[in-house]
UniProtKB/Swiss-Prot annotation:
Induction: Expressed in the early phase and late phase of the viral replicative cycle.
Subcellular location: Host nucleus
Function field: Involved in viral genome packaging through its interaction with packaging proteins 1 and 2.
Segments for region (Disordered): 1-27
Composition bias type Low complexity, residue spans: 7-21
Note, other: All late proteins expressed from the major late promoter are produced by alternative splicing and alternative polyadenylation of the same gene giving rise to non-overlapping ORFs. A leader sequence is present in the N-terminus of all these mRNAs and is recognized by the viral shutoff protein to provide expression although conventional translation via ribosome scanning from the cap has been shut off in the host cell.
Protein origin, superkingdom: Viruses
Gene Ontology CC terms: host cell nucleus
Keywords: Host nucleus, Late protein, Viral genome packaging, Viral release from host cell
Location (main, coarse): host cell
Quaternary structure and interacting proteins, as annotated: Part of the genome packaging complex composed of packaging proteins 1, 2 and 3; this complex specifically binds to the packaging sequence on the left end of viral genomic DNA and performs packaging of the viral genome. Interacts with hexon-linking protein IIIa; this interaction is required to promote correct genome packaging.
Protein name, as recorded: Packaging protein 3
Length: 27
């Protein structure tokens, strides 16, 4: 999946992967 979709839908990603994604979205 595209990186944009992964950021928009962090729920699909594993909890361990949600942390780095949120870190980029929420500084």
């Amino acid at each position: 999946m595209h990186p944009v979709l992964r950021q928009m839908r962090p729920q699909q990603q594993a909890p361990s992967q949600q942390q780095p994604q949120k870190a980029l979205l929420a500084p």
